[in-house]
């Protein structure tokens, strides 16, 4: 992302699940585009950032074969080393998965809270991972996608579960510029909640970003 008035974003959308007809597939290549598509140069200028949105699929013992967490993680380290995103919005992360990411994405820190009020170990997070050498964390917190967004664990409208959003203000070290970032996971099993959730997010953008910093949203 260049820090201009109108901000084009270098975005990478990664699908965690995948397959291959090869009898011995190289799962570490899951994330790559087909060979017919020219890959982008992962390097960045001093006034750019790279943003990734990544639904890692919550840990589920019923997932087997190439859908299993253990198989899918073989692509996670080479993908990050190859693409070097500045910030990553993660969806569907359970605490054991967060622990794995923290231990293996060593150049990154992360922020986030569980979607329920008690931060239970089987709870889901929508954390933000950030490259520590590229950005400085200025401040962060969470709010909930409900009629009472400042109440931890609150569940609004026809959401099937509580939905949380993680927000942060970062300072880009190379340029000295700050930007505002939100990561969340909109409920797809409801009718009213998606639109109402976006209303909450838009209101929170104004409330939490009074400086009018460049804004980014992953979901």
Which role fits each region the language model picked out?
Residues 162-184, 191-219:
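His/acidic metal-ligating clusters that form di-metal
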Residues 48-61, 138-143, 177-187:
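Active-site-proximal beta-strand elements of phosphoester/diester hydrolases
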Residues 62-66, 85-87, 154-155, 185-191:
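Second-shell loop/turn segments in exported
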Residues 119-121, 190-193:
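Solvent-exposed loop/turn segments connecting transmembrane beta-strands
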Residues 29-43, 87-182:
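Structured beta-strand-rich core segments of catalytic domains in phosphoester-bond hydrolases
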Residues 1-8:
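Bacterial N-terminal signal peptides that target proteins for export
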Residues 14, 46, 82-84, 134, ...:
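Alpha-helix termination/capping residues and helix-transition junctions
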Residues 7, 17-104, 115-123, 199:
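N-terminal, active-site-proximal structural segment of metallo-dependent hydrolase catalytic domains
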């Amino acid at each position: 992302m260049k820090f201009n008035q109108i901000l084009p974003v270098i975005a990478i959308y990664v699908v965690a699940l995948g397959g291959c007809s090869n009898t011995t597939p190289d799962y570490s290549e899951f994330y790559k585009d087909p060979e017919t598509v020219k890959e982008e140069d992962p390097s960045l200028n001093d006034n750019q950032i790279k943003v990734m949105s990544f639904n890692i699929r919550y840990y589920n013992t019923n997932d087997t074969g190439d859908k299993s967490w253990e198989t899918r993680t073989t692509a996670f380290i080479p993908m990050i080393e190859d693409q070097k995103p500045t910030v990553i919005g993660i969806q569907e992360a359970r605490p054991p998965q967060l622990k794995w990411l923290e231990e293996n994405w060593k150049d990154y820190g992360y922020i986030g809270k569980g979607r329920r009020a008690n931060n239970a170990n089987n709870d889901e997070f929508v954390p933000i991972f950030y490259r520590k050498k590229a950005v400085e964390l200025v401040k962060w917190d969470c709010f909930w996608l409900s009629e009472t967004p400042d109440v931890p664990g609150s569940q609004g409208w026809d959401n099937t579960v509580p939905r949380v959003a993680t927000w942060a203000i970062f300072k880009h070290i190379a340029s000295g510029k700050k930007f505002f970032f939100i990561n969340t996971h909109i409920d797809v099993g409801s009718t009213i909640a998606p639109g109402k959730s976006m209303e909450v997010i838009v209101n929170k953008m104004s409330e939490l970003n009074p400086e009018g910093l460049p804004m980014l949203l992953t979901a």
